[in-house]
Design a protein with these regions (language model features):
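Glycine-centered flexibility motif
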Residues: 1, 27, 88-89, 205
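Noncatalytic carbohydrate-binding groove/subsite architecture in carbohydrate-active enzymes
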Residues: 17-23, 150-210
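Long, low-complexity, intrinsically disordered polar/charged segments
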Residues: 39-66, 202-210
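Alpha-helix initiation/capping motif
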Residues: 37, 67, 98-99, 108, ...
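Short, acidic/polar
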Residues: 30-44, 70-74, 113-125, 188-203
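Mature N-terminal, pre-catalytic/accessory segment of carbohydrate-active enzymes
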Residues: 1-45
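Substrate-binding cleft and catalytic face of glycoside hydrolase catalytic domains
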Residues: 45, 49-61, 72-182
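A short linear-motif detector with a strong N-terminal bias
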Residues: 4-9, 28-31, 112-114, 152-154, ...
Length: 210
């Protein structure tokens, strides 16, 4: 942890020296409280971006239209403080994120794929004018309890980015990874390390910004 902080400080100093005007984004995670919009943050004057998680299970606890009132309230909270917003991840594969009604068995991959596209499509259509960065997926490089293959997880990542791009061609899109140094490879055999997973996405020319 100390090494990571030292490395981040050194990189920031180098970046400031190289650029007359800093383009660095410094922010925090903005969770949705029970009373959405009531949250206040003492250090927000020092930040220029907030990360707004979007949980599929909370937005769509049962089949039907998404319930985005809390998300929209927090987006407006950030806009009222002239902050940029990174929204997402729009897809994770853990139990906390996926709705209980969704059949996520490995043999039902095509149904999950279709439901994921529909979910992301609804989000982007309703929020695209309020979001500055889309966080498409998180942690799909690593195996999960649901036993999806590496190819299926890569396909879901590509689908998420392509769905965003079909409905929003301009907003930057990012993808994040669990254990980017590949610690899980010591006990979980995979063909693609995190860096190769990322390289595959970059070579696909999907329009990912980071």
């Amino acid at each position: 942890e100390d090494l990571a902080c030292w490395d981040a400080e050194a990189l920031m100093k180098m970046r400031i020296l190289q650029q007359l005007t800093s383009t660095a984004l410094i922010g925090f995670r903005l969770d949705i409280p029970e009373q959405a919009g009531s949250q206040d943050v003492d250090f927000f004057p020092t930040a220029n971006i907030c990360h707004l998680p979007i949980c599929w299970n909370q937005c769509q606890p049962e089949p039907g239209p998404l319930k985005l009132e809390g998300v929209i309230d927090q987006l407006e909270w950030a806009r009222g403080r002239e902050m940029r917003v990174m929204a997402g991840p729009l897809l994770r594969l853990d139990d906390e994120h996926l709705p209980a009604w969704l059949d996520c068995a490995a043999e039902s991959f095509q149904q999950l794929q279709a439901a994921t596209r529909d979910h992301i499509e609804q989000l982007v259509e309703r929020l695209h004018d309020k979001v500055d960065i889309w966080h498409a997926t998180a942690g799909l490089n690593r195996p999960h309890d649901r036993k999806f293959s590496e190819e299926q997880r890569l396909r879901l990542t590509v689908d998420a980015v392509e769905t965003i791009r079909r409905h929003d061609r301009h907003t930057p899109v990012v993808v994040s990874f669990d254990q980017p140094w590949g610690e899980y490879l010591a006990h979980q055999q995979q063909d693609l390390s995190p860096i190769h997973f990322a390289e595959t996405l970059v070579r696909a020319n999907l329009g990912i910004s980071g």
